[in-house]
């Protein structure tokens, strides 16, 4: 994908961190619960991609992709880890999230990036927003240094120390977002071969399952 400049990345991370900081501990009166939207998105993010009867012909998109999807769907540990993440996503939190922080919600302007689509906002786990950002950096083949810059820059702007459990949760959410963009109905205009998509799906399995094991061993997670 097109390389994201460090300046644009920093601006995106700054906007996300500013949103999260501004509403830490916010006492919601129901305005930002956004339950109906969140439940709809939960289906599309965590359930539909793993449902073989979702009506999506993956082989029409990329011949052979349905077989790769079946292998992922038959991995019971992976499916269980995704279900656990889905429960974390639905759990009310104390941070206002954008809720759909991917390139389709970013506008490039002469004054720098701008963010749209606030209708997805809800109070939840901030790692979800960061995970979505990381997922799309990976799907755009951004270099590892850009991903590290995003994660480090976010932590610095939030003012938190490095937290292995939080980082693991970010990567788990990133893996699920990649999965739903590869084998779910919310497809991206990716010009990628079957081999490339298989590689991404192997990465997805590792990100979700290994990060889940890491979280359990450290005593964190949902």
Describe each model-derived feature in a short phrase.
Residues 145, 175-222:
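ATP/Mg2+ or Mg2+-diphosphate-binding catalytic cores
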Residues 81-128:
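Active-site acidic catalytic loop and adjacent metal/ATP-binding pocket
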Residues 1-32:
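ATP-binding pocket architecture of kinase catalytic cores
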Residues 9-12, 16, 127-130, 171-179, ...:
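Short runs of predominantly hydrophobic/aromatic residues within well-ordered alpha helices
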Residues 30-86, 183:
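Active-site catalytic-loop/activation-segment of kinase and kinase-like phosphoryl-transfer enzymes
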Residues 127-159, 174-193:
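Active-site activation/catalytic loop segments of kinase-like enzymes and analogous catalytic loops
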Residues 159-169:
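Acidic, serine/threonine- and proline-rich low-complexity regulatory regions
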Residues 20-27, 158, 186, 211:
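A general structural signal marking secondary-structure boundaries and capping sites
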């Amino acid at each position: 994908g097109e390389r994201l400049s460090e300046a644009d990345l920093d601006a995106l991370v700054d906007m996300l961190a500013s949103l999260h900081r501004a509403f830490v501990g916010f006492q919601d009166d129901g305005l930002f619960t956004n339950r109906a939207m969140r439940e709809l998105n939960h289906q599309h993010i965590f359930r539909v991609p793993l449902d073989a009867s979702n009506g999506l012909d993956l082989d029409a998109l990329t011949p052979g992709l349905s077989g790769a999807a079946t292998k992922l769907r038959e991995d019971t540990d992976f499916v269980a880890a995704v279900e656990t993440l889905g429960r974390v996503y639905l759990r009310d939190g104390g941070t206002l999230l954008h809720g759909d922080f991917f390139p389709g919600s970013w506008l490039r302007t002469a004054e720098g990036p701008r963010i749209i689509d606030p209708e997805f906002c809800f109070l939840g786990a901030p790692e979800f927003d960061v995970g979505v950002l990381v997922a799309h950096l990976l799907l755009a083949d951004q270099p590892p240094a850009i991903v590290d810059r995003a994660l480090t820059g976010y932590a610095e702007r939030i003012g938190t120390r490095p937290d292995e459990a939080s980082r693991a949760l970010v990567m788990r959410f990133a893996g699920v977002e990649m999965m739903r963009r590869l084998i779910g109905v919310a497809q991206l205009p990716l010009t990628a071969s079957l081999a490339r998509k298989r590689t991404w799906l192997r990465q997805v399995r590792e990100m979700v399952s290994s990060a889940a094991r890491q979280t359990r061993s450290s005593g964190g997670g949902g």
